[in-house]
UniProtKB/Swiss-Prot annotation:
Record organism: Shewanella sediminis (strain HAW-EB3)
The protein's assembly and partners: Binds to the N-terminal domain of the chaperone ClpA.
Protein name as it appears in the record: ATP-dependent Clp protease adapter protein ClpS
GO biological process: protein catabolic process; proteolysis
Function statement: Involved in the modulation of the specificity of the ClpAP-mediated ATP-dependent protein degradation.
Lineage start: Bacteria, Pseudomonadati, Pseudomonadota, Gammaproteobacteria, Alteromonadales
Family, as annotated: Belongs to the ClpS family.
PANTHER family, per the entry: ATP-DEPENDENT CLP PROTEASE ADAPTER PROTEIN CLPS, ATP-DEPENDENT CLP PROTEASE ADAPTER PROTEIN CLPS1, CHLOROPLASTIC
Pfam families, alphabetized: ClpS (PF02617)
InterPro entries: ClpS (IPR022935), ClpS_core (IPR003769), Ribosomal_bL12_C/ClpS-like (IPR014719)
Disulphide bonds in the chain: none
Amino acid sequence: MGKAVNIEHVEERVESELMPPPMYKVILNNDDYTPMDFVIEVLQLFFKKNEQDATDIMLAIHNQGKGICGVFPFGIAETKVAQVNQFARQNQHPLLCSLEKA
């Protein structure tokens, strides 16, 4: 008739299926040429930061060499990095966006 099911095995499988995806930090790196106003624009346009948050992150980038724009699942982080880097190149700025595991 029916097949016996190992409850512990099912619970373990369900638990592993519900694991959240690995998260990645999207980072903007400082350079000596990109204007601060452009960095603020990028933060507002691609990361939906308000003016104060964008300014705070821009100052962190300027003073510490890099700043975290947000933490996202890999696919979203990868897309944002590509969008920001393309936007920077289109506007002739060397601003570099990268990602690292959170």
